[in-house]
């Protein structure tokens, strides 16, 4: 759109410059002819009309139909000068050059239909025909014998009644109102050339006469000039597009930056975990030579005490602790043995069920009904703590049999390979059971609730997830066994479809009801109460 407008502007500017050049050349040559040959006083007008008519044939000067431009050029100054010369000399009007009026028009109303875009050159003959026809609009005028005898029968009254009227054709304005003597002013002295009229003759472009519904414009097309409204609209569109492009570019940059930051954080997590496994914080600090200025100066350990004395104190303290533990162990073992010697005693089996398991509320209803030693404990995954779980286990054991301890235990919770999801924000992994104090305390207290009189190692089964699907699962079990020493505890997490898994399920559940519960565990179509 911009390229087409600029191309049109270039064509119009070239056309106007060529018109101006031709007009100047014709006027200069006409002046030369009028000076060298006085009988051709109107030579400039001939050449000026020829320049316009010759130029109008060029395709780039054909205006758009809606412009309806008209260029009127009247040689009234030279016409009046020739008439005054004839009046003073007293010679007949037929002798000497005949006055002419040249009119170049683009008005469609003044031209034939087939030549709506052509230029009409009207040659009005001299005084004799005007005296013969005083009202020249009553009969059409004929061209001079030397001309092409073109019919110029359109009345000058219609020219004078056009939109521009006598402003552009003052010669016609003189011819319209009265007879020939008053129209040509033969008795009057020669009128001096009006400066405004001469100026209009010298101009190469005049005011346009256009239709009433279109505002009057000059020879310069309005769209070639600077239009503030169009420019403002274009600037607004450009600014809107620039803002849209800027927002898209900023969004792309933010997305790429977030991806880079996310990948870098992931890289730091991976590298940091390996570094923690490789060396402790103290070792890293000792080996680090680039300390911050705010770090305290590392001080050597106080060696004033003899190392031999400190080692003796540590060994004696350990000996006292072991003696106390042995005494407690023997006391607790005797009490448990006394409780188990009663008739009909069955070693308790504790089921610890997390509420996070789907349809966990139905699990207590599918346990083995022929085994009263199974103690189901359903805890709240979201709000319970390790202390709450331990207190509930102790309370249920005392209710079952005072002084009884756990022989077998089932932990039914969510998790995955290498980790147990015991509580909200409490995930048991092989690293966390070594570092987090509350988790270490939980497993140590749980070990004290395990049986001491069981000739076989106590068993803790894990259901709801497959811990051993990852090598970290075996590390987790190993760390838990280390935490629960001196009690003999083993951890098992077999697949439910295996033989060991079937044996584990039959230890705690009615196998038929368990399969039914498992098939309806993730279903919302049928309520499990109806099945039971």
From Swiss-Prot:
Keyword Nucleus listed: yes
Subcellular location field: Nucleus; Nucleus envelope; Nucleus membrane; Nucleus matrix
Organ and tissue specificity: Preferentially expressed in immature migratory, in comparison to postmigrating, gonadotropin-releasing hormone (GnRH) neuronal cell lines (at protein level). Expressed in adult brain and liver. In the brain, expressed in the primary pituitary gland, cortex, hippocampus, olfactory bulb and thalamus.
Keyword Cell membrane attached: yes
Biased composition range(s): Polar residues: 155-164
Gene3D superfamilies in the cross-refs: iswi atpase
Bilayer topology annotation: Peripheral membrane protein
S-S bridge residues: none
Region Disordered, annotated ranges: 34-67, 127-174, 275-315
Segments of skewed composition (Basic residues): 127-139
Modified residues annotated as Phosphoserine in this record: 206, 292, 294
Induction comment: Up-regulated by gonadotropin releasing hormone (GnRH).
GO cellular component, one term: nuclear matrix
GO MF annotation list: calcium-dependent protein binding
Composition-biased stretches (Basic and acidic residues): 38-48, 302-311
Region (Necessary and sufficient to elicit dendritic processes and synaptic contacts): 2-235
InterPro entries for the chain: NSMF
UniProtKB keywords: Cell membrane, Cell projection, Cytoplasm, Cytoskeleton, Lipoprotein, Membrane, Myristate, Nucleus, Phosphoprotein, Synapse, Synaptosome
N-myristoyl glycine lipid sites: 2
Membership in a protein family: Belongs to the NSMF family.
Miscellaneous comment text of the record: Transport from dendrites to the nucleus is induced by NMDA receptor activation and results in a rapid stripping of synaptic contacts and a reduction of dendritic complexity. KIF5C associates to its 3'-UTR mRNA in granules along dendritic shafts, suggesting that this protein may regulate its dendritic trafficking and local translation at postsynaptic sites.
Name of the protein: NMDA receptor synaptonuclear signaling and neuronal migration factor
Designated gene of the protein: Nsmf
